[in-house]
Curated annotation (Swiss-Prot):
Residues of the CP-type G domain: 59-212
Cited SUPFAM superfamilies: Nucleic acid-binding proteins, P-loop containing nucleoside triphosphate hydrolases
Subunit structure: Monomer. Associates with 30S ribosomal subunit, binds 16S rRNA.
Enzyme Commission number, as recorded: 3.6.1.-
NCBIfam families xrefs: ribosome small subunit-dependent GTPase A
Any one Gene Ontology cellular component term annotated for this protein: cytoplasm
Molecular-function annotations in GO: GTP binding; GTPase activity; metal ion binding; rRNA binding
Enzyme superclass (EC): hydrolase
Keywords from the named record: Cytoplasm, GTP-binding, Hydrolase, Metal-binding, Nucleotide-binding, Ribosome biogenesis, RNA-binding, rRNA-binding, Zinc
Protein name listed in UniProt: Small ribosomal subunit biogenesis GTPase RsgA
Residues that, per the record, bind GTP: 108-111, 155-163
Function field: One of several proteins that assist in the late maturation steps of the functional core of the 30S ribosomal subunit. Helps release RbfA from mature subunits. May play a role in the assembly of ribosomal proteins into the subunit. Circularly permuted GTPase that catalyzes slow GTP hydrolysis, GTPase activity is stimulated by the 30S ribosomal subunit.
Superkingdom in the source lineage: Bacteria
Amino acid sequence: MKGKIYSINSGIYSIKDENNNFHNLPALGVFRHKNIVPLVGDYVEFEKEKYITKIYERQNEFIRPKVANIDHIIIVMSIHEPEFQSFLVDKYMAFIESANIEPVLFNTKADLGTSKYKNEYESLGYKVYEISYKTDEWVKNIAKLFTNKTNVLMGQSGVGKTTLVNKITGSNFAVQAISKFANRGKHTTRIVQIVNVFDNGELIDTPGFSSLDINLTKQQLAYSYKQFKELGKFCKFKTCFHQNEPENFCNIKQAVKDNIIPQFRYNNYLKLLQEVENEQK
C-alpha cells in the first residue's frame, strides 16, 4: 500500500493512504541501520498492520522542522508584539532558500499597524500577506496558496501562528499570551503534523522558537538567497563572500550600491555571515 506520513509520535508513523484512511505503524529496522529517518511529508509504501517498507525519493527536505516534500515554508512574523524583525526573516529565508524551498511571508497582527518592509520584500520577489484577525478577508486571500500544496508554518513564539492555524482549520490549539518579561510567547505547538486545509491543501504547523542556528557554511550562505545566487554568478571570484572583496570585484556589493538589493538585506547578510564565522570557530 502507498501513503503519506502525516505525523510521528514516539517512533509510530501516522500514514494517510490513497483512500484517505489512516494507519499507525513503525518503520522497518533496515531504515535505522541505513541512517534513514522517515519524516512527516514522506511518501511511503507499507504493509497493512505491519511496517513502512519503502520511502520514495524526496523532492526536498528541511531540518528544522524535520519535514519533506514541501512546496512553501511560510514565515510568520508579527508587525507588533513582538516587533517585526527583518534580521530574523532574512535568517529564516537564507535557511529555507538554501534547501531550494520557496519562502512566503505572513505579517500577522496587521490591525496594530503596517510593516514598512512589505514593499521591500515584494520587490525582492517574495509573496507577502498581511493578516489582521479583526476580519476573515485574509483567509480567502491565502486559500490559493494552499490549493494542492504542502506548506509549513515557522516563526518565533508568540507571533500568532496558533491563532492563524485555528482560523484556517477551525481547530482549537492552545494559545498562550505573550510573556511581557521575555517579550515572546511561550511554546504552544509540540508535535509536527499535517492538517488538511482549503482545497486539498496541507498545512504543517511546527513548534515556535526564539532562536535558530543557521547551520550553513559561509559559501552556502553567500549563495542562499535566490537573488544572491543569480547576481553572484557575475562576481569575479567563485568563492566571493560579498564581504571584504573590492566593490568592482563583487556584483552583490554593486547591486547594493545600485539599490537592487536593499541595504537592510545586505546588512542582515553580513550579520549572518558573522554568526556563521562565530559558529565555525
